[in-house]
From Swiss-Prot:
GO biological process, any: ribosomal large subunit assembly
Protein's gene: rplT
Name of the protein described by the UniProt record: Large ribosomal subunit protein bL20
CDD domains xref list: Ribosomal_L20
HAMAP family on file: Ribosomal_bL20
Length: 117
C-alpha cells in the first residue's frame, strides 16, 4: 500500500508554527523561516540558561564588594574573613543582606574585621 506523508508533514509544520506563535511577520507564518527562528531561539535559550548563572554570580559579587567597601573591607578580604569566622553564607544571601539589611551586613563586616586583625 502506498504511504502518503501529508499527515506527518502537516503535524511537523504545525508544531513549529505553534512554537513560533507571537513572532513577527513571516517568522510566525512561513514554515521555513519559522523553523529557523524557533531552532535559533531554542539554541539561545539553552546557552542563556548557562549564562544567567554567571551573570547573577557577577551581580552578587559586585553588590557584596560595594557594601564591603562601604564598611572598609575589600571583597576578597571580606570573603576570607567570613571563612575564618566560620560563617557559611553564600553569595546570593550576602548580596541580599547588602541590599536589604545594611545594618546586619555592617555587623558582619565588623566581625570580619575583628577576625582579620
Amino acid at each position: 500500500m502506498r504511504v502518503k506523508r501529508g499527515m506527518a508533514t502537516h503535524r511537523r509544520h504545525k508544531k513549529y508554527l505553534k512554537m513560533a506563535k507571537g513572532y513577527r511577520g513571516g517568522r510566525s507564518k512561513l514554515y521555513r523561516t519559522a523553523r529557523e527562528a524557533v531552532e535559533r531561539s531554542l539554541a539561545y535559550s539553552t546557552r542563556d540558561r548557562k549564562v544567567r548563572k554567571r551573570e547573577f554570580r557577577k551581580l552578587w559579587i559586585l553588590r557584596i564588594n560595594a557594601a564591603a567597601r562601604e564598611n572598609g573591607v575589600s571583597y576578597s578580604k571580606f570573603i576570607h574573613g567570613l571563612a575564618l569566622a566560620g560563617i557559611e553564607l553564600n553569595r546570593k544571601v550576602l548580596a541580599d543582606l547588602a541590599v536589604r539589611e545594611k545594618e546586619d551586613f555592617a555587623k558582619l563586616a565588623e566581625l570580619v574585621k575583628s577576625k582579620l586583625s
